[in-house]
C-alpha cells in the first residue's frame, strides 16, 4: 500500500518538481530572511514559513504559465508543454493544499486565516489581470498598481504576516511591503520588454505576445490617447520579432521606459526611507540595491 501511495505522490508532484529544478532567483526566500533581521522568528518556524511561501509561489507559476499561454519559463519549456494542462493544474492545486497542511503545523490560531486571506488576494489580482488582457481593457496606472498589490503583495504579505505571528516586533510593515511589491512587479515589467537578460531567458518580449497590459505599455497607451498602435499590437498576440521590436522602439520614443525607470527610482528611494524608519536593515537594503542594478547600470 505504501509503495502505491508513494508512486501516486511522485506522479502528482512531477510537474511541480520539474519547475523546482529550473534555476530561480529565490527572491522570496531572501526577502523573508532579510525581514527576520527585525522579526527574529525562531528558526524552525521560519523554515516552515519559507517553505510554504516557495510552494505557493511555484504552484502559482505553473498556473500562470497556463493562463498566459507561455512557452518558456526561465529559458526552459513550461511544465504544461511537457506534462499537459490537466496534470499541471492538478499538481499546482495539490501543492496549494500541501501548503495549507504545512501552515497547520505552525499551530497558531491565526495562521490559516492569514493564509486564506492572502490566497484570496492573489486570485483577485490574477483575475483582474486576466480580465483586462482578455477583454482588451487598458487599466489606469492606479488600477494597475492596486492589482499588483493584490497579486505580488499576496505572497509577500503571507510570508511576513505569518512571521509576525511568531514575533514580538509589532511595527506595521504593510507600507514597506506595498512599496516592495510594486517595485518587484514594475521591475519585472521593465525587464520583460527592455533587458538583455530577460530576452535570453524568456522568449523575446513575452508580455507583448501574451497581450498583457504592463507598466510601460499602460503609460504609452494613456500618454498617447490619439494612437492605438500599442493596443493593436497587444491584441494580435504576435510572435513576430519585427513587430515586437517596433513596439519596444515606440515605447522608447514616447518616453515609457524613461517613465518606468523614474517610477522605479522613486520606489527604490521610498523603500530605503521606510526601511530606515523601521530601524534600518542592511540585508534588505542590499537586496533592493542588487535588484536596482538592472535599471540603473544599463543607462549610465
UniProtKB/Swiss-Prot annotation:
Known catalytic reactions: isopentenyl diphosphate + dimethylallyl diphosphate = (2E)-geranyl diphosphate + diphosphate; isopentenyl diphosphate + (2E)-geranyl diphosphate = (2E,6E)-farnesyl diphosphate + diphosphate; isopentenyl diphosphate + (2E,6E)-farnesyl diphosphate = (2E,6E,10E)-geranylgeranyl diphosphate + diphosphate
EC category name: transferase
Originating gene: Ggps1
The keyword Transferase appears for this protein: yes
Alphabetized Gene3D superfamilies for the sequence: Farnesyl Diphosphate Synthase (1.10.600.10)
Gene Ontology molecular function terms on file: (2E,6E)-farnesyl diphosphate synthase activity; dimethylallyltranstransferase activity; geranylgeranyl diphosphate synthase activity; identical protein binding; metal ion binding
Pathway this chain belongs to: Isoprenoid biosynthesis; farnesyl diphosphate biosynthesis; farnesyl diphosphate from geranyl diphosphate and isopentenyl diphosphate: step 1/1; Isoprenoid biosynthesis; geranyl diphosphate biosynthesis; geranyl diphosphate from dimethylallyl diphosphate and isopentenyl diphosphate: step 1/1; Isoprenoid biosynthesis; geranylgeranyl diphosphate biosynthesis; geranylgeranyl diphosphate from farnesyl diphosphate and isopentenyl diphosphate: step 1/1
Native source organism of the sequence: Rattus norvegicus (Rat)
The protein's required cofactors: Mg(2+)
Localization in the cell: Cytoplasm; Cytoplasm, Perinuclear region; Cytoplasm, Myofibril, Sarcomere, Z line
Binding locations of isopentenyl diphosphate: 25, 28, 57, 74
Official protein name in the record: Geranylgeranyl pyrophosphate synthase
Protein role: Catalyzes the trans-addition of the three molecules of IPP onto DMAPP to form geranylgeranyl pyrophosphate, an important precursor of carotenoids and geranylated proteins.
Transit peptide found in the keyword field: no
Domain of life: Eukaryota
A Pfam family matched in the record: polyprenyl_synt
Amino acid at each position: 500500500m505504501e509503495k502505491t501511495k508513494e508512486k501516486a505522490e511522485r506522479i502528482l508532484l512531477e510537474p511541480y518538481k520539474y519547475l523546482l529544478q529550473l534555476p530561480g532567483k529565490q527572491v522570496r526566500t531572501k526577502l523573508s530572511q532579510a525581514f527576520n533581521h527585525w522579526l527574529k522568528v525562531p528558526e524552525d518556524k521560519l523554515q516552515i514559513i519559507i517553505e510554504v511561501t516557495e510552494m505557493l509561489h511555484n504552484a502559482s507559476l505553473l498556473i500562470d504559465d497556463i493562463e498566459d499561454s507561455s512557452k518558456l519559463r526561465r529559458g526552459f519549456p513550461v511544465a504544461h508543454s511537457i506534462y499537459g494542462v490537466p496534470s499541471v493544474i492538478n499538481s499546482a492545486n495539490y501543492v496549494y493544499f500541501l501548503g495549507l497542511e504545512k501552515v497547520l503545523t505552525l499551530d497558531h490560531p491565526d495562521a490559516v486565516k492569514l493564509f486564506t486571506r492572502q490566497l484570496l488576494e492573489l486570485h483577485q489580482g490574477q483575475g483582474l489581470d486576466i480580465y483586462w488582457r482578455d477583454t482588451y481593457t487598458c487599466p489606469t496606472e492606479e488600477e494597475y498598481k492596486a492589482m499588483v498589490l493584490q497579486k505580488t503583495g499576496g505572497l509577500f504579505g503571507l510570508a511576513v504576516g505569518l512571521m509576525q505571528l511568531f514575533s514580538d516586533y509589532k511595527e506595521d510593515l504593510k507600507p514597506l511591503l506595498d512599496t516592495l511589491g510594486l517595485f518587484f512587479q514594475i521591475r519585472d515589467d521593465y525587464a520583460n520588454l527592455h533587458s538583455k537578460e530577460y530576452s535570453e531567458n524568456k522568449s523575446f518580449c513575452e508580455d507583448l505576445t501574451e497581450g498583457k497590459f504592463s507598466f510601460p505599455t499602460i503609460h504609452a497607451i494613456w500618454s498617447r490617447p490619439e494612437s492605438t498602435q500599442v493596443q493593436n499590437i497587444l491584441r494580435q498576440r504576435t510572435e513576430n520579432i519585427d513587430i515586437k521590436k517596433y513596439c519596444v522602439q515606440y515605447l522608447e520614443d514616447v518616453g515609457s521606459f524613461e517613465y518606468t525607470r523614474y517610477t522605479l527610482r522613486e520606489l527604490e528611494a521610498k523603500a530605503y526611507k521606510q526601511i530606515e524608519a523601521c530601524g534600518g536593515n542592511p540585508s534588505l537594503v542590499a537586496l533592493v540595491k542588487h535588484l536596482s542594478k538592472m535599471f540603473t547600470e544599463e543607462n549610465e
